[in-house]
């Protein structure tokens, strides 16, 4: 996988061969990747705004005022401007997940990774998070999303991958994947959820 011209996890040696990268060599590449987990991992002792500005200020060295301006714009994008000064414990699961998305976006990543971002949510709040993710995709954000939300995957993806026991068994466009899967396991999976 390449991010902004860098192969993730590897660097070329003096002979041009790819070798495993050290943690130090990976740090600049990692800073280009946002990650949103199943659990929101918000700091409970910090407000929504403080959660969002923490990494840009501490990791990127961004001025606090600039980080606040970016955070306020991101809160507007995820429709949580009114929660700026709230603590995570006062938010619904869907609201917390949208804060987690805003927090990742505050680092201005080239790529966003989502690990089952709706699996820990109540059914009523899933749509809030999927709508924000859809807007990101439509805005051109490159995303890799592990999900069982097949309607979302079908609508937003340009590639769909099916894994079984850690092995890719099917890959293709949404049309291919949902209408003409080639692997029997994929057909079984789709018949149970669609």
Walk through the language-model features, giving the residues of each:
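ABC ATPase "signature
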Residues: 171-172
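Short coil-to-helix segment of the ABC ATPase nucleotide-binding domain corresponding to the Q-loop/switch region
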Residues: 46-54
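Catalytic Walker B motif of ABC-type/P-loop ATPase nucleotide-binding domains
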Residues: 112-115
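Helix N-cap at the start of a conserved alpha-helix in ABC-type nucleotide-binding domains
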Residues: 123-125
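A short, surface-exposed alpha-helical micro-motif characterized by mixed small hydrophobic
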Residues: 153-155
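Conserved signature/switch motifs of ABC ATPase nucleotide-binding domains
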Residues: 86-89, 107, 139
């Amino acid at each position: 996988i390449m991010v902004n011209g860098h192969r993730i996890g590897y660097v070329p040696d003096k002979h041009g061969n790819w070798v495993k990268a050290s943690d130090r060599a990976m740090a600049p590449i990692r800073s280009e990747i946002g990650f949103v987990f199943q659990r929101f991992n918000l700091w409970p002792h910090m407000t929504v705004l403080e959660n969002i500005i923490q990494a840009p200020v501490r990791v990127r060295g961004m001025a606090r005022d600039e980080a606040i301006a970016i955070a306020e714009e991101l809160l507007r994008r995820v429709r949580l401007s009114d929660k700026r000064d709230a603590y995570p414990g006062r938010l619904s699961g869907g609201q917390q997940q949208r804060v987690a998305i805003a927090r990742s976006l505050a680092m201005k990543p080239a790529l966003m990774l989502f690990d089952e971002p709706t699996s820990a949510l109540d059914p009523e709040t899933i749509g809030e998070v999927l709508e924000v993710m859809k807007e990101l995709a439509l805005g051109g954000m490159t995303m890799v999303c592990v999900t069982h939300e097949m309607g979302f995957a079908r609508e937003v993806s340009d590639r769909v991958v099916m894994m079984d026991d850690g092995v890719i068994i099917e890959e293709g466009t949404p049309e291919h994947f949902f209408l003409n899967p080639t692997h029997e396991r994929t057909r079984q999976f789709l018949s149970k959820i669609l």
